[in-house]
Amino acid sequence: MKKTYWQEVHEQCAEKDNVCFKKNKYRCEQTIITKLNGVPACTIRTKSDYQFEWVENLKRPAMNAYCKLLEQFVSVYPPSYQKPLEMIIDLEKIKFESVFDIDMATGKMAGIVNHNEIVEKWQEYKKNMLDNYSFLRSADTKENVNAFIDSMEKVIVDEKLLMAEFYGKMIFLLLFDGYLVGKPNYAATTNIEFPSQLFQGVKFPMTLTPRIQKESAEAVIYELKSSVSDTAKLTERIKKEYDERFKPSIQYRFSSYNAQFNSHVLLNEKERYVQEAECYITEEIVNNLSLTIHCKIRQIV
């Protein structure tokens, strides 16, 4: 059987003394609540275990990282959403075979070095899925299955779209940062392109301000708080998305958009890894629609 890119990296690590290999396991528990006109419409609770591995070349600045999804459990209300989520979990395991090139200036993901492997795994999964649903007779059901496959394929085969999806996942926002390359930021504000969780494909400028809460020789506890410009709150693209997707059921017209991101991180600065973290994201069309995400991660053995 052909070895994967990451298996080959493992073998090279064993043969070279200028390469540093590290790994941690994390447990991530996340709750997403969507409310329409103040009434809960959908709640998704996800429990996941991940293996986070990274390799650094000690002679020249270069790093690869790999975050494998070990197991995942999802509960959803209303239950009618459960079946589509089960297929999405299968696809998550494929996506999480990605190996990332790390930007040595920021600690952020710069690209997927084994993207071709992910596409190959997707093609195999798609073939099996089409075989499993070949019995379908209903034209509407067939159309829904094909639409689902097309929407997934659009993301997986496009490295930039897949990267954007990873940046929308809380665990990636928390694990991939300056500390990973020995350049943590506890003072200066940073500007990011925040990926909306409420409106797919929408990004807008967000300013993050750090503040140290507690520190020792080896560890730091710090928080990040966000601010969004008034321009982003009234963006035409968000208004258009709201009018098309939500206004028909909510009826109330678009008011204004707001988003908040807050996180608390316990960082082992000496060994350069997150020990535990908690973050909140809230997005809303004021008075009409809201999405709240609460995510906690912690290192496990």
Residue ranges of predicted features:
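Signature of exported/secreted
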Residues: 2-301
